[in-house]
Amino acid sequence: MPGIKVYPNESFDEAYRRFKKQTDRNLVVTEVSARRFFEPMTEIRKKQKISARKKMLKRLYMLRRYESKL
């Protein structure tokens, strides 16, 4: 779980910004929203398939973009 130490000369806004950044990096909010409701295995596999396809298309796009510059 993320935690920060607030320095004496640091404002609340700065400390809050650091805390938000740390929670975003640790994917705390994403994990909480994912665990909020039960997800059947079929839904998990469906999401994994979609993300794998996105990754593959992104790699293909980058490869074609790189090849066109040669």
UniProtKB/Swiss-Prot annotation:
The keyword Ribosomal protein applies. GO terms for cellular component: ribonucleoprotein complex; ribosome. One of its GO terms (molecular function) is structural constituent of ribosome. Pfam families: Ribosomal_S21 (PF01165). Signal peptide: none annotated. InterPro entries: Ribosomal_bS21 (IPR001911), Ribosomal_bS21_CS (IPR018278), Ribosomal_bS21_sf (IPR038380). This is Small ribosomal subunit protein bS21. The lineage of its organism: Bacteria, Pseudomonadati, Campylobacterota, Epsilonproteobacteria, Campylobacterales. Keywords: Ribonucleoprotein, Ribosomal protein. Belongs to the bacterial ribosomal protein bS21 family. One of its GO terms (biological process) is translation. It comes from Campylobacter hominis (strain ATCC BAA-381 / DSM 21671 / CCUG 45161 / LMG 19568 / NCTC 13146 / CH001A). The keyword Ribonucleoprotein applies.
